[in-house]
Amino acid sequence: MSFDNLRYLESEAIHIIREVAATFSNPVVLYSIGKDSSVLLHLAMKAFFPGKPPFPFLHVDTRWKFREMIDFRDRMMREMDLKLIVHVNQDGIDQGISPFRDGSNVHTHMMKTMALRQALDKFSFDAALAGARREEEKSRAKERIFSIRNAQHAWDPKRQRPEMWRTYNTRVSAGETMRVFPLSNWTELDVWEYNQKENIPVVPLYFAAPRPVVQRGAGMIMVDDERMPLEPDETVTQRMIRFRTLGCYPLTGAIESSAETVPEILREIVEARTSERQSRLIDFDEAGAMEKKKREGYF
């Protein structure tokens, strides 16, 4: 990717972030700790330099994230001196919701979708910036940069507004909110090339290292803590792996890889023949799973 293209993508994203700050009364950044969130955080810092972003960062904690993700989150927020809101769906905790016992669909609905809706309502946020990209998944491919949600935080593809020549309709009615995706036009390759250019810190799990995994179905699941139950025929082995995408560890498959640096990751992406979200189990709960989740309020 040329430097000029990265500069255009950066300029577009910063313009969108500033547009949100200028037109909404109480925006927030959804910080999921992944590589896209790291780029979004970096862009938000650039957009308001030498000041700080005029809005908080929200992390919806499912209690099943990789431990390295939580350590990275806390370190970044502390070093940058940013306001972080961590929200957990206490109803889900009280019910003992688990991706192992209840499955990915129930877990995601309770601990991600419902938790996000609770947080947006609790703090009366009227706009939520997030790092989703159109290239990632087909339902995201057809979503606008400024994506209006109704009073129940649901997405209706038929209500999408035209977006032409970087002109955005930011108006919302009472009770409605807006999800905003400044990285909509970025690809996975763009994200990593920008990471290389700007030297953006990311969770170490993106880089290959020997890690404990079990082979489960067609995927490899990393054993991140003692809560993971093993099937009778499963054995934990050390393998050289990394992750292209990060989420709850029981629902995120690893890939075998020797890519320990950003240039090596870039070469691997160019040669890849599968989507980066191919290893995210929540995308395959049912036909049209991601669009259904978005209609229910998922980011």
Curated annotation (Swiss-Prot):
| Catalytic activity from the UniProt record | sulfate + ATP + H(+) = adenosine 5'-phosphosulfate + diphosphate
GO process annotations (BP): hydrogen sulfide biosynthetic process; sulfate assimilation
Q: Which UniProt keywords are given for this protein, alphabetically ordered?
A: ATP-binding, Nodulation, Nucleotide-binding, Nucleotidyltransferase, Transferase
Q: Does the keyword Nucleotide-binding apply?
A: yes
**Organism the protein comes from:** Rhizobium tropici
Q: How does it assemble?
A: Sulfate-activating enzymes, NodP and NodQ, may be physically associated.
Pfam assignment, any one: PAPS_reduct
Q: This protein is called what? A: Sulfate adenylyltransferase subunit 2
Q: What is its EC number?
A: 2.7.7.4
Q: Does the keyword Cell membrane apply?
A: no
Q: What domain of life does the UniProt record list for this protein's source?
A: Bacteria
Per the entry, what this protein does is: Proposed to provide activated sulfate for transfer to nod factor.
The UniProt similarity line reads: Belongs to the PAPS reductase family. CysD subfamily.
One GO MF term on file is: ATP binding
